[in-house]
Amino acid sequence: MSQGTIVQCIGAVVDIQFPREAMPKVYDALKLENAAGSFAEEGLTFEVQQQLGDGVVRTIAMGSSDGLRRGMKVASTGKGISIPVGHGTLGRIMDVLGRPIDEAGPIEADELRPIHAKAPKFDELSPSVDLLETGIKVIDLVCPFAKGGKVGLFGGAGVGKTVNMMELINNIAKQHSGLSVFAGVGERTREGNDFYHEMKDSNVLDKVAMVFGQMNEPPGNRLRVALTGLTMAERFRDEGRDILFFVDNIYRYTLAGTEVSALLGRMPSAVGYQPTLAEEMGRLQERITSTKVGSITSIQAVYVPADDLTDPSPATTFLHLDSTVVLSRDIAALGIYPAVDPLDSTSRQLDPLVVGEEHYNVARQVQVTLQRYKELRDIIAILGMDELSPEDKLAVSRARKIQRFLSQPFHVAEVFTGSPGKYVPLKDTINGFKMIVNGECDHLPEQAFYMVGGIEEAMEKAKKLQ
């Protein structure tokens, strides 16, 4: 175990000098000497980012750098950051270094795995076309998820990314008998606490492993915490299991990379992001994949800065996803939740060969009707409904019913709305929208379709309104 001394501290970036012949490798973990003169596991950890030459390495502190000073002793562990994986992590909350933060004693791990690993080889990958039912109408209809696929929830501030993710966890993780891993990357600590209690109250805590590196953590922690969660998910996948991997929020991962890049003195690229943005994103996303042994289905929340989907961070994330669920501020302003934009959201699974002719045709008819309404909105605003042709009046009437029928009460929002959450099976979703586009519901008032589950519930509500 080679030892070095701190020669410079600039915030989270620390330069450490080692003997020339014993310089640590890039991504090696280093430990700080404690007051007792030992290099304890719970002490401050550094990760090597650059070798500057002459025995000096530039590192990022994986914790607060308060109290560091020049001349302090640091030891190389000779390997990268390794974390406990396996069944001992289920029901536990860990930090980026795999240390428990739930005050429930040490974690009994099957093994320790390094967080830096190569993506599976091309011949080990396994494509998947099986659909994953979510019980959320708008998602199942226009942007269906694939088992073993990658899904992104895109949205600006306050349009419901985390609530949608919590509902997906509620509907999938509880129905799905497999295991889940949740990585909280740079988000609010309160949300992590809510998530933990939600899982505990639902009695599924023993099927979930959680890792958090929240907003108050240094950039090194936020940059690596997604890899920690992914390493845990990979271990379960390699056992032949189907894993759900939730990440909230991928944008904070990018942002932490930007902070680290600036601290390391790299020249920024477009909009101030790090020059290695595409490579860093690819390194994470290429590992989130399904092999012939097991699958990882990943659902990632992606914050969209200033609601601009062309921003380099969300734009780079788009490339890696199978389904994109775009949350719209305009739809949220109408009071329609989930505020998913059915015209902007896409999925590779929405193909007649995968979902079947009926599902595909209904979804496309819904989109065509909503698109026609969008085109007519300006005319309606200027001239009013009376100036439209009978066909257009009918299209607008159906579109407004579809728009309201795309809303749905959530289980996780019951405490705020007072209305019980609804899980809608896929066949009921297709049947409901098919009836609306075919004109079988033209006689019903549009208010009857707002915040209901299936079409039968809308009909019951219509009877009460009449």
Swiss-Prot record:
GO terms for cellular component: plasma membrane; proton-transporting ATP synthase complex. It catalyses: ATP + H2O + 4 H(+)(in) = ADP + phosphate + 5 H(+)(out). It is an enzyme of class 7 (translocase). It is found in: Cell inner membrane. It comes from the Bacteria. Its EC number is 7.1.2.2. One of its GO terms (molecular function) is proton-transporting ATP synthase activity, rotational mechanism. ATP binds at residues 155-162. It is a peripheral membrane protein. PROSITE patterns: ATPASE_ALPHA_BETA. Keywords: ATP synthesis, ATP-binding, Cell inner membrane, Cell membrane, CF(1), Hydrogen ion transport, Ion transport, Membrane, Nucleotide-binding, Translocase, Transport. Belongs to the ATPase alpha/beta chains family. Produces ATP from ADP in the presence of a proton gradient across the membrane. The catalytic sites are hosted primarily by the beta subunits. F-type ATPases have 2 components, CF(1) - the catalytic core - and CF(0) - the membrane proton channel. CF(1) has five subunits: alpha(3), beta(3), gamma(1), delta(1), epsilon(1). CF(0) has three main subunits: a(1), b(2) and c(9-12). The alpha and beta chains form an alternating ring which encloses part of the gamma chain. CF(1) is attached to CF(0) by a central stalk formed by the gamma and epsilon chains, while a peripheral stalk is formed by the delta and b chains. This is ATP synthase subunit beta. The lineage of its organism: Bacteria, Pseudomonadati, Pseudomonadota, Betaproteobacteria, Rhodocyclales. The gene is atpD.
